Amino acid sequence: MNESQPKLKYKRILLKFSGEALMGKSQFGIDPSVLDSLARDIAELIHMGVEVGLVLGGGNLFRGKALSQAGVGRVTGDHMGMLATVMNALALRDALERIDLPARIMSAIPMLGVVDPYHRRKAITHLRNGQVVIFAAGTGNPFFTTDTAACLRAIEIGADIVLKATKVDGVYSADPLKNSDAKRYDYLTYKEVLTKGLEVMDSTAICLCQDQGMPLQVFDMAAPKALKRIVTGERVGTIVGANHDQ
C-alpha cells in the first residue's frame, strides 16, 4: 500500500447490498447508474488495498412473498430468488469489468459455463490477488436469507466485518420515515438487536455473527465516500458487536 494512503482498519470486508437498492428510483430491475456508482466505490477500495467480497439480494427482480400469496411453494420461491441474485451478480461483474476491475462470481448453486461454483479456498485466493468476489445464490438452501448468506460467507473467508448498505444512515428504534421520535443508535450489541426486535438482519444472521464474533456495520450507501470512511475507521452508521467498545 502506498504510504500516502490512509491506514486501513479493515483489510477484508464483506459488503451486503440489497437487490432493492439496485433499482435506484425505479420500481423494478436494475438502474445502470447505481451499478456504475457501486463499481466505482469498490474500485476505490481495491486501489487502497482492501479485499472486497459481496453478496447481493434479489428483491429488485423477484419477490417471493407475492408469489407465495399466489400459491407458489416456499422452497420453489426461494430457489427462484437465488437465481435472481445470480442475475444481479452478472450485472455487477459486467460493471466492474467495464472499469478494468477483475471480478469473480462464485455461486452456491453450480452453473458451469456461467459462473464459478463456490469454493472457500479459491475465494480467498481470488481476494488475495486483488479480485472482487461476488457470492451468489445465497447459501444454496431454502429458508435462509441473503443476509444470513452474507454473514456465513464473511465468517468463512475470514472477513474483518460485514457492511450492510441500506437507504438510511444506521439502525433506528423505529422507522424514521414514519416516526419523527425514532432514535438512531451508534452502537448495539447482538443481544440488544435480538431483544429489541430491531430490523438489522434476520435473527439467524445475527445469531451466527454473535456466535462467531463477526461485527456488523449498517450504513447509508448514499453517504459521501461511506465505504472509504468505514474501512479507515470512521464511525459511519451503526456498529453491532459483542459490546459497545467494538
From Swiss-Prot:
What are the disulphide bonds in this sequence?
none
Positions with a binding annotation for UMP = 58, 78, 139-146
Reactions catalysed, semicolon-separated, are:
UMP + ATP = UDP + ADP
Which Pfam families does the record associate with it?
AA_kinase
Q: In which pathway does it act?
A: Pyrimidine metabolism; CTP biosynthesis via de novo pathway; UDP from UMP (UMPK route): step 1/1
Q: Which GO terms describe its cellular component?
A: cytosol
The GO annotation for biological process reads:
'de novo' CTP biosynthetic process; UDP biosynthetic process
Modulation of this protein's activity: Inhibited by UTP.
Give this protein's Gene Ontology molecular function annotations. ATP binding; UMP kinase activity
As for family, the record states: Belongs to the UMP kinase family.
Which HAMAP family does its entry note?
PyrH_B
Question: What is the protein's quaternary organization?
Answer: Homohexamer.
Purpose = Catalyzes the reversible phosphorylation of UMP to UDP.
This one is known as Uridylate kinase
